[in-house]
Amino acid sequence: MAFHARITIFAEGAHGSLTKTLVKKYNLRKKSDPQTYGIGLKEVWEVPKEQWREGEITHSMGYPLDKDTYGGGFMYHFGENLVSLGLVVGLDYRNPYLNPYQEFQVHTSSLTILY
């Protein structure tokens, strides 16, 4: 298939097969320091007073992601008995079956510190 246009915009996403082909064919990463992007998922939970620790911040790296996927989690205690729980997953992951939302569910279900 041939495209003929003054400008062509490709907007298929960071993992698109066409994008990867174009980057490789035209060496689009040469002399660049490309940014990386991630998707963040967050929930706010109300917890019992005895499990809430005002101002406490916890960060984690890796788990539950595999060794080839970067990211990590966070837990912020704030407000009155509120905890913000989140997971960030780098969008350069290679596993096409990785589901950031499912990984977030694994992350939040493993937080025994809140139970």
Regions found by a protein language model. Give the residues of each.
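Predominantly flavin-linked oxidoreductase catalytic cores and closely associated redox partners
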Residues: 1-114
